[in-house]
């Protein structure tokens, strides 16, 4: 996702708009850049830079928000269940709860959004390492971002949104 609005005033940006040297946050002009720096950008600039610059940092924040919404929306349905990928109820690293956003029935289909994202990243990396692009085998792996590997139905609703932000 390319950020197309000034971080200070939200005005649309030209393609060659000025940027923060460290984190690449974009501004409509140097006045907005200086104003944004004084209003607190300097406190988060290093964090944005470490997070992969402005666009990746923004996508990561949106992913975290979307996962929180998805876990909350699925909370009643997922009580007492475990992730079919890592077999844990609460993810060991992210501490996130389970989601369910496909057509699986019974005890199948409960998963952590971060487990789905990690599985998809591994499959895509494997496909790229094996030079499968642009074959059907590559696209089968790419579909893991939006399709359940168990029921082969598309994820929907808040789960689709969370996994979509993960693939950024």
Residue ranges and their predicted role:
Residues 24-44, 107-125:
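Cys/His-coordinated zinc-finger cores
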Residues 11-15, 27-28, 33, 37, ...:
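Short functional micro-motifs and their immediate structural scaffolds
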Residues 10, 24, 33-36, 46-49, ...:
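Cys/His-coordinated zinc-binding microdomains
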Residues 16-24, 35-40, 98-107, 127-145:
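Short linker/helix segments within small regulatory modules
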Residues 2-7, 58-72, 119-135:
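Short Cys/His-rich Zn2+-coordinating modules
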Residues 1-18, 75-102, 150-160:
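Small Cys/His zinc-coordinating "RING-like" fingers
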Residues 5, 19, 26-31, 41-44, ...:
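The −1 position to Zn-ligating cysteines in a subset of zinc-ribbon hairpins
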Residues 46-49, 111-157:
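RING-type zinc-finger domain of E3 ubiquitin ligases
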């Amino acid at each position: 996702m390319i950020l197309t609005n000034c971080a200070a005033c939200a005005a649309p940006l030209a393609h060659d708009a000025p940027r923060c040297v460290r984190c690449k946050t974009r501004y409509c002009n140097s006045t907005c850049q200086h104003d944004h720096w004084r209003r607190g950008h300097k406190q988060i600039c290093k964090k944005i830079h470490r997070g992969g610059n402005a666009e990746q940092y923004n996508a990561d924040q949106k992913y975290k928000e979307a996962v929180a919404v998805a876990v909350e929306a699925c909370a009643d349905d997922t009580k007492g269940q475990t992730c079919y990928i890592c077999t844990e109820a609460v993810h060991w690293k992210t501490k996130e709860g389970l989601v369910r956003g496909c057509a699986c029935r019974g005890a199948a289909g409960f998963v952590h959004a971060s487990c789905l994202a990690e599985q998809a990243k591994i499959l895509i990396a494997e496909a790229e390492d094996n030079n499968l692009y642009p074959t059907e085998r590559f696209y089968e792996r790419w579909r893991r971002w939006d399709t359940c590997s168990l029921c082969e139905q598309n994820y929907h609703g808040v789960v689709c949104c969370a996994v979509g932000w993960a693939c950024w």
